[in-house]
Amino acid sequence: MLESVLHALHLNETFLAMLISFLILVFILQQVAFKPILKALDERRQKVEESISRAENDLEEANRMRAENAAELAKARQEAHDLIARATKVGEEKAQEIVAAAQAEANRLKEKAVADIQREKEKALEELRSHVVNLSILAAEKVIRKNLDEPTQRQLVDEVINEVGKLPC
């Protein structure tokens, strides 16, 4: 009966034996080779997925760190800018204080010099008055001692003028 079915299907016994051998081989390969190969492929797929997941996590961490670094850099730049602004302000204030102190000192020295000059002027005027008084007294003594005629009077006035011209002013 099997022979008639095979013959009707145009199959021969060799083909049937080969088919049975192939099916047994597939079953054995499935038990022995396919399961380990599929298991190895599945493990490899899991490793690749884990690597991709780690890479994504690392990328997220790198992006987070880059954002933190950018924020810290911006903060440091702002702090440096603020520090420079404060230092500039303090420097300008110190410069203004120095200029104000120098102007005050210059004014004080000027006032002192003016006061010194005024004292010296008053002293010189006092000395001049003293000399003029002394010369006037001398002239009066000479007038009293002499009977003055006009040429003697002129000579006496010339002498007084010459002596006044010799005074240090």
Swiss-Prot record:
Q: Which family does it belong to?
A: Belongs to the ATPase B chain family.
Record protein name field = ATP synthase subunit b
- Tell me where the transmembrane regions lie: 14-34
According to the UniProt entry, its GO molecular function terms are:
proton-transporting ATP synthase activity, rotational mechanism; proton-transporting ATPase activity, rotational mechanism
- What gene is behind this protein? atpF
User: Which organism does this record belong to?
Assistant: Heliobacterium modesticaldum (strain ATCC 51547 / Ice1)
Q: Which domain of life is it from?
A: Bacteria
Matching entries from Gene3D superfamilies are given as: F1F0 ATP synthase subunit B, membrane domain
Task of the protein: F(1)F(0) ATP synthase produces ATP from ADP in the presence of a proton or sodium gradient. F-type ATPases consist of two structural domains, F(1) containing the extramembraneous catalytic core and F(0) containing the membrane proton channel, linked together by a central stalk and a peripheral stalk. During catalysis, ATP synthesis in the catalytic domain of F(1) is coupled via a rotary mechanism of the central stalk subunits to proton translocation.
In terms of CDD domains, this protein maps to: ATP-synt_Fo_b
Q: Cellular location of this protein?
A: Cell membrane
What is a single Pfam family found in this protein's UniProt entry? ATP-synt_B
- Assembly: F-type ATPases have 2 components, F(1) - the catalytic core - and F(0) - the membrane proton channel. F(1) has five subunits: alpha(3), beta(3), gamma(1), delta(1), epsilon(1). F(0) has four main subunits: a(1), b(2) and c(10-14). The alpha and beta chains form an alternating ring which encloses part of the gamma chain. F(1) is attached to F(0) by a central stalk formed by the gamma and epsilon chains, while a peripheral stalk is formed by the delta and b chains.
Annotated SUPFAM superfamilies: F1F0 ATP synthase subunit B, membrane domain
- GO CC, alphabetical: plasma membrane; proton-transporting ATP synthase complex
Q: How does it sit in the membrane?
A: Single-pass membrane protein
Q: Which keywords, in A-to-Z order, does the entry hold? A: ATP synthesis, Cell membrane, CF(0), Hydrogen ion transport, Ion transport, Membrane, Transmembrane, Transmembrane helix, Transport
